[in-house]
């Protein structure tokens, strides 16, 4: 839905920009204002009160969305031998080592998450400049550098997603599809906010959650009250 289209303008008129909506209200309105031509993705955009340029104010982590994202993630695993077999058995879409690295260097990035066994990280470091900016670099803090590749693959396939603040102190998380029931969207939202609050750096002073907007890929932004994370009865 183009922002210049009549349908988008009509959808935007349904949003009261002077109001801060509850998570459930925002989820319901996101569904109502989304294009009916496709099952749009529902995303949360958060402006954080941190300075990402400082190492002690980096915000990153993982969240297991109780209802998933509505999309089965494609997972790449850097592993060899038994670990490679375990990853494949768990449902990994791409498994390899030097061969996988060469494919990525050649431009192949057809996956949503990457996992590596610890012994592969020295090799994976060669493509850090490719994976890092895309949020695909395996990291022990997010559970994607691990010997238990089967569990890591299962977690990601089951709805576990990573989040990381960008250079402008913004953070984006997908919480589902417009076809989801609004309560499921709100519950995914609550789970995501819980983890983001848990990841608050001790060095962050003042207001941590500065601004929150929920939107679909085809609809207008809906401002959400940062003080309300799990009051699902408000709708």
UniProtKB/Swiss-Prot annotation:
<keyword id="KW-0678">Repressor</keyword>
<dbReference type="InterPro" id="IPR005878">
    <property type="entry name" value="Ribosom_uL1_bac-type"/>
</dbReference>
<comment type="function">
    <text>Protein L1 is also a translational repressor protein, it controls the translation of the L11 operon by binding to its mRNA.</text>
</comment>
<dbReference type="InterPro" id="IPR023674">
    <property type="entry name" value="Ribosomal_uL1-like"/>
</dbReference>
<dbReference type="InterPro" id="IPR028364">
    <property type="entry name" value="Ribosomal_uL1/biogenesis"/>
</dbReference>
<dbReference type="Pfam" id="PF00687">
    <property type="entry name" value="Ribosomal_L1"/>
</dbReference>
<keyword id="KW-0810">Translation regulation</keyword>
<dbReference type="GO" id="GO:0003735">
    <property type="term" value="F:structural constituent of ribosome"/>
</dbReference>
<keyword id="KW-0699">rRNA-binding</keyword>
<dbReference type="GO" id="GO:0006412">
    <property type="term" value="P:translation"/>
</dbReference>
<dbReference type="GO" id="GO:0015934">
    <property type="term" value="C:large ribosomal subunit"/>
</dbReference>
<dbReference type="GO" id="GO:0000049">
    <property type="term" value="F:tRNA binding"/>
</dbReference>
<keyword id="KW-0689">Ribosomal protein</keyword>
<dbReference type="InterPro" id="IPR002143">
    <property type="entry name" value="Ribosomal_uL1"/>
</dbReference>
<dbReference type="GO" id="GO:0019843">
    <property type="term" value="F:rRNA binding"/>
</dbReference>
<protein>
    <recommendedName>
        <fullName>Large ribosomal subunit protein uL1</fullName>
    </recommendedName>
</protein>
<dbReference type="InterPro" id="IPR016095">
    <property type="entry name" value="Ribosomal_uL1_3-a/b-sand"/>
</dbReference>
<comment type="subunit">
    <text>Part of the 50S ribosomal subunit.</text>
</comment>
<dbReference type="InterPro" id="IPR023673">
    <property type="entry name" value="Ribosomal_uL1_CS"/>
</dbReference>
<dbReference type="GO" id="GO:0006417">
    <property type="term" value="P:regulation of translation"/>
</dbReference>
<comment type="similarity">
    <text>Belongs to the universal ribosomal protein uL1 family.</text>
</comment>
<keyword id="KW-0687">Ribonucleoprotein</keyword>
<keyword id="KW-0820">tRNA-binding</keyword>
<keyword id="KW-0694">RNA-binding</keyword>
<comment type="function">
    <text>Binds directly to 23S rRNA. The L1 stalk is quite mobile in the ribosome, and is involved in E site tRNA release.</text>
</comment>
């Amino acid at each position: 839905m183009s922002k210049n289209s009549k349908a988008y303008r009509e959808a935007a008129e349904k949003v009261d920009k002077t109001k801060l909506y509850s998570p459930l209200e925002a989820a319901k309105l996101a569904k109502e204002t989304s294009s009916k031509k496709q099952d749009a993705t529902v995303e949360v955009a958060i402006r954080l009160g941190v300075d990402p340029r400082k190492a002690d104010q980096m915000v990153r982590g993982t969240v297991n969305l109780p209802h998933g994202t509505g999309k089965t993630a494609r997972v790449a695993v850097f592993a060899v031998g038994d670990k490679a077999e375990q990853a494949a058995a768990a449902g990994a879409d791409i498994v390899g080592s030097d061969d996988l690295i060469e494919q990525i260097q050649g431009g192949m990035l057809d996956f949503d998450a990457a996992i590596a066994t610890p012994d592969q990280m020295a090799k994976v470091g060669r493509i850090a400049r490719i994976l890092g900016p895309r949020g695909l670099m395996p990291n022990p803090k997010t559970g994607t550098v691990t010997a238990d590749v089967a569990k890591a693959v299962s977690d990601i396939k089951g709805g576990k997603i990573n989040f990381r603040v960008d250079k402008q102190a913004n953070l984006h998380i997908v919480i589902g599809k417009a076809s989801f029931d609004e309560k499921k969207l709100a519950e995914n939202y609550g789970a995501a906010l819980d983890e983001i609050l848990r990841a608050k750096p001790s060095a962050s002073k003042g207001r941590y959650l500065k601004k929150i907007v929920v939107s679909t890929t085809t609809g207008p932004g809906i401002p959400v009250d940062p003080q309300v994370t799990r009051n699902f009865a408000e709708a």
